[in-house]
């Protein structure tokens, strides 16, 4: 079913969580935490927000208040009760009302209303993961936070042993961000990048007054291979580029 039941080892839930981290770059807090908790308002109230300009939160749409606070307005909840719906939350902590089929058709065109049976029968979570208890949502967020930290640590560890000194090797941590796997892959898509490293050094031949700069770029793949490109430049000469692919064990 489309509901989270507290079992993170469930095959469908694990598959959803893994894809969610990769595709959406899971954050440690939902974006609506940036907003203050809003009191219940009716259509004539103006929410008081600490903004330096006149702002009406209702202008953002029918579910804006639910997005900001994780709870529905009284008006939204009354509509949900009228339709015999049940409360649920999305992975972003946004409140939704899941309405049984007996209220359909017609289902009012309100963006906080969703068909209950369609969500319950969604075993593969193609419509997303839903929580019928806010405590379960918080439990899932906590699990995902730990999972992301574990993934980052695992990938960082795979690169760290290859470093010589901070001066010799500069890790490009932007490319290690969790969730970028789909972007960083080999041309044929057969393997994924798990890390990058770069080093720049300057050498000077005793017989030549012209110094040379050697830039080495390494790309680490999930199959244990390393793509190495070395570019040597010196003043007055064309850059010399060498490229090779070796195993991690052969990389030195």
UniProtKB/Swiss-Prot annotation:
It is found in: Mitochondrion membrane. Residues 230-252 are annotated as: Disordered. Pfam families: MPM1. Its main location: mitochondrion. It is a peripheral membrane protein. GO terms for cellular component: mitochondrial intermembrane space; mitochondrial membrane; mitochondrion. It comes from the Eukaryota. Keywords: Membrane, Mitochondrion. Present with 3390 molecules/cell in log phase SD medium. This is Mitochondrial peculiar membrane protein 1. It comes from Saccharomyces cerevisiae (strain ATCC 204508 / S288c) (Baker's yeast).
